[in-house]
Amino acid sequence: FEYVIEQLDTIKKSLNRTISLITGKAGTGKTSIMRAIVKAYTENQFTMTASALSAMAAQRITEATTFPAMTIHRTLGCVGLNDFTVNKDNHMITSVAFLDEGSMVNASLFLHWLEAIDDNTRIIISGDHKQLPPIGFGNVFSDLIEMFDDTVVSKLVKPMRQAEKSGILVDANLIRENINPITEKLQPRIIHGELQDMYYMFRTNRQSLFDIAVKTFLKSVESDG
């Protein structure tokens, strides 16, 4: 695997800055960059925490980096509503604090996470600042991206080669830019992407759409559980 220039610049920035913010849409290599950053820090004996809002996102970090990530609530030792054992009076003991899916974190939880970090700890936050805002008040990650300059912020724009093959990612990014991904003549089934992983089904009435949706769902349950 070879990193492109913007990815290398992002990795270097994250290893040399006290605060580093990484933003980019799906398929621009955030996970690969995260893997390199975690590897560099851990191999050089830095202590590190890796956190995400959801358990699924934390699991993805662990799978991608082999580094044990946790939810923010578990990292902070949540014992009740907005009650954490790791806090401004009892900081987390770590050289580097990494937060993934930063755009999903609301202002209240972000404040608790930030207060639990020591002044000498390096901070790395990754996410997509153009995603839907988090549940709860505040859109902290997006505000941070707009507030800091490119000495702190890395904006990834170049899609990785594998992402360019995915119909799901290509079409999602078109929709994100308010561009209709379907340009061909409508037919019952349209497949997009070199990987053929994105398909559309069209029917002439609501009942047919309902039937195909139920059938597809049941088939997925049968195959994937």
Per-segment meaning from a language model:
Residues K30:
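Conserved lysine of the Walker
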Residues S20-T23:
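Short hydrophobic/aromatic beta-strand immediately N-terminal to the Walker A/P-loop
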Residues F1-K12, N16:
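Pre-P-loop entry segment of helicase/translocase ATPase cores
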Residues L99, S126-G127:
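Hydrophobic residues in beta-strands of the RecA-like P-loop NTPase core, especially within AAA+ ATPase
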Residues G27:
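Walker A (P-loop) phosphate-binding loop of P-loop NTPases
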Residues T10-K13, K130-G225:
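Conserved helicase motor core of P-loop NTPases
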Residues I33, I37:
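Hydrophobic positions on the alpha1 helix immediately C-terminal to the Walker A/P-loop
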Residues F46-A116, K155-P159, I168-I182, L195:
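Conserved P-loop NTPase motor core of helicases/translocases
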